A protein has these predicted regions:
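Mid-domain alpha/beta scaffold segments of enzyme catalytic cores
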Residues: 1-252
Length: 252
């Protein structure tokens, strides 16, 4: 398959789980990892079956009510229904202890499971890496990771991938190993700086990466899919993906 035939890929965005079919059809065929912010929202999203949307099961670390709703049984059930566990992680806006308790439980239950994890780390980059050092997971994707160069190197050594967006600095984007890069919009957050008009709109990000990596735009698009194919193969996630995405990754 030509890189020009690959649809846009967005590995971290937010879409309301009651989105309509026509609204999804307006997203240009983009493959989107749609995060949820609470277990209740994740359970609602699990009822859907959309060929281009991978619905996550999340507990956003900035939402205290979401953290208290995290249970071992709930995570075990989620890991059988969701390919993506996210948005999860740590945030500096709320107390650390409940966040760590929820994250450690999620990492424990998901150990060895065929899922990918989309991890938030605002203001807690070092503490998040400590948690992943104690409980590593082959499917860890660090969403909008604003750590230092040393922390990026540490995360890469742990096997982490990085979902990046156009609001990140050229310097930080250049620090991340090219083979670990995945695209995101984090829509609807920071639309002015990401320039994403919709979930899956990675046009400006791909322009930035084309200039930064000195690659043609088609090669950047192909790179995203090659990296995702490697990640899903090593985590045994590939058989669980929607058929259309499996075909796309099989051509990488």
């Amino acid at each position: 398959m030509s890189p020009f035939d690959l649809p846009p890929l967005d590995c971290h965005a937010h879409i309301a789980p009651d989105v309509t079919g026509p609204q999804i059809a307006a997203l240009n065929g983009a493959i989107i990892f749609a995060m949820t912010r609470s277990p209740a929202e994740g359970r609602f999203a699990a009822r859907r079956s959309d060929p281009t949307i991978l619905w996550g099961y999340g507990a956003h670390p900035g939402l205290a009510s979401a953290l208290t709703a995290v249970t071992e049984d709930g995570i075990r059930r989620a890991a059988t229904k969701h390919v993506v566990i996210g948005e999860i992680g740590l945030d500096n806006k709320t107390a650390l202890a409940p966040q760590l308790a929820a994250l450690d439980l999620i990492l424990d239950v998901c150990a060895g499971q065929p899922v990918v994890l989309s991890l938030h780390s605002t203001g807690r980059t070092g503490v998040l890496l400590d948690a992943l050092t104690r409980r590593p997971h082959a499917g860890a994707i660090l969403h909008w990771f604003n750590g230092t160069r040393e922390q990026i190197d540490r995360a890469a050594a742990l096997g982490c991938y990085f979902s990046v967006n156009a609001a990140m600095s050229d310097e930080r984007l250049a620090w991340i190993p090219q083979e670990r890069l995945l695209p995101e919009t984090d829509f609807p957050s920071s639309r002015r700086t990401t320039r994403a008009r919709t979930p899956g709109d990675i046009t400006f990000l791909e322009q930035r990466m084309s200039e930064l990596l000195q690659l043609q735009a088609a090669a950047v698009r192909s790179m995203w899919y090659t990296n995702l194919a490697t990640l899903t193969q090593r985590t045994s996630v590939t058989p669980r993906l929607p058929a259309g995405l499996r075909r796309l990754l099989g051509d990488c």
